[in-house]
Each structure stands twice: as C-alpha cells, then as structure tokens.
C-alpha cells in the first residue's frame, strides 16, 4: 500500500513503478480521480512507453458510485485473467480509499447502519475481498500496489488502519519530505515490508537495518543538531548518523524520469553502510 495525503506525489510514484516495471502485463485502475488528473497521469506520469504496455480502467469522480466500485473489481479481474494465462502482472489501483468512499455511498443508500466515521459494515467486508485477490498462484502472479488517500494526513483513519492490517508492505509518503523537494517523499522509518526477509539476501537485509538505524538516530537528535546544541564526539552513533545523513539522502532521492536497477541499488546501499563516515 502507498499511504499519502493529497498532493504528496503518489500518482508520480505510480508512474515510476509502471515505467520501471519488468512485469509481463500492467493493469491500472483509476477510481474516483478527476478527469483532468487522469489525463495528466496518462500523459505525464505514465508516459508513452508505460501506456503502450498497460491496460487502464477509469471511473472518474463524477461517475455513479456503482461504476466507481465496478472499476476496481474490473481492473482486478483483468489482472487475474492475465495471471491465469501464465503472466506476471503489475496491478496499480489508485485509489482504494475512493473505492471505499463509493461503497460507503452504496451501503448507506441501501440502508446499512453507519459505523466508524460513517462507514457501513460492507466497506470493511469488501476491502479484504478486493486485496486478497492479488498474489501468486501456480500459473502466474499479481503484484499489486494500492494507493491509500489519508484524510488530513491521519494515518489512523478507518480505511488506512484496516488496509495496514491487510497489506504486506506499507510505503508511507511524507508531506514534510515533499516540501523539502525530496522525491519520491518516502518516509523510510514509517514504511515497512513484512516480506523483506524472504525477498533479499542477508547482506542486503543487514544493510537496510543499518541505514534505518542511522536515519532513526539522526531524527531523534535533529532538533539538537539544528540549533547547534550537539557537540561532535559526544556520541559515536550520532556522529555516524550525521556523517551518513547526506549520502543516504542522495541515495533515496530519485528523478521521476530515472529508472534504477535493483541489483545496482542494493550494491550501492551495501557500499554506503560499509564505508566509514559514508564517504
């Protein structure tokens, strides 16, 4: 799941994923987006190369709630059909929150009782049914990214909270990083992957842990560092975190038009955390 407030860059990140994907097929579901945003995504974010190898299902915000709900199921069904044909599929659904909004409209209109923040029970029944349809079978696979629009940057609102328990990975986009022109604005410390130990080597896993420790140490002492109250040499861990700050930031920043090689990125991360003072 890609969790983000409005205007933080989730559409740009989806376009980067689509253009850089090595999947056999790409299926994109755009649910509840404005018509202008759909056009901008297809032209600017997805691009000609990405669009040429993608199936796009769209139900804009002005369409009836039933049609918006149907768009999410349709995109998922198309991905399943490709998977059953033996393909590895990338499914991008933007956004599962607006799918939940549409189902809320239908549920309330049907007379369901509102529960948490006005959501009827059918919303929380449909969310697991939707996301559980992705994954690997004996024939192929569906790797799915679901964007979650966090209302008011509240990551504990009901839809986001439910999806955190359903999804294997959480990519948290930070408004503060976006304001610093840190693109993509992924908050590494808030993000996690439950499957990471099964997907990367032990060496890469240890490098990830080391990098996160440096970032965490710097964040804990950021106020002291900013006002000049921290004295170099007071704590070796903080000294290392300060030295690694810029190298790690440069590693995490990526131009939207750039496609990074996974093996090269892993090797670069290993080199960074092994090099004294990040030099």
For the regions a protein language model found, what residue spans apply to each?
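P-loop NTPase catalytic core
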Residues: 1-279
């Amino acid at each position: 799941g890609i969790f983000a407030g409005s205007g933080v860059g989730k559409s740009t990140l989806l376009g980067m994923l689509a253009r850089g994907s090595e999947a056999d097929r790409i299926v994109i579901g755009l649910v509840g987006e404005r018509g202008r945003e759909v056009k901008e995504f297809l032209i600017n974010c997805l691009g000609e190369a990405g669009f040429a190898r993608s199936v796009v299902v769209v139900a804009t915000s002005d369409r009836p709630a039933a049609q918006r709900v149907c768009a999410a199921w349709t995109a998922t069904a198309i991905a399943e059909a490709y998977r059953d044909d033996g393909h590895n599929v990338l499914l991008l659904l933007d956004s599962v929150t607006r799918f939940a909004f549409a189902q809320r409209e239908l549920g309330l209109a049907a007379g369901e009782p509102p529960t948490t923040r006005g959501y009827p029970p059918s919303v929380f029944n449909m969310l697991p049914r939707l996301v559980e349809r992705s994954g690997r079978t004996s024939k192929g696979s569906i790797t799915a990214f679901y964007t979650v629009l966090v209302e008011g940057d509240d990551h504990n609102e009901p839809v986001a909270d439910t999806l955190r328990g359903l999804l294997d990975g959480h990519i948290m986009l930070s408004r503060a990083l976006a304001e610093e022109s840190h693109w993509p604005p992924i908050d590494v410390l808030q993000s996690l992957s439950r499957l990471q130990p099964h997907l990367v080597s032990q060496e890469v896993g240890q490098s990830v842990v080391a990098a996160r420790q440096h970032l965490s140490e710097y964040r804990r002492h950021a106020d002291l560092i900013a006002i000049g109250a921290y004295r170099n040499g007071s704590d070796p861990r903080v000294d290392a975190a300060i030295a690694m700050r810029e190298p790690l930031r440069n590693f995490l920043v990526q131009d939207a038009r750039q496609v990074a090689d996974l093996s090269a990125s892993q090797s670069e991360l290993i080199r960074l955390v092994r090099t004294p003072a990040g030099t």
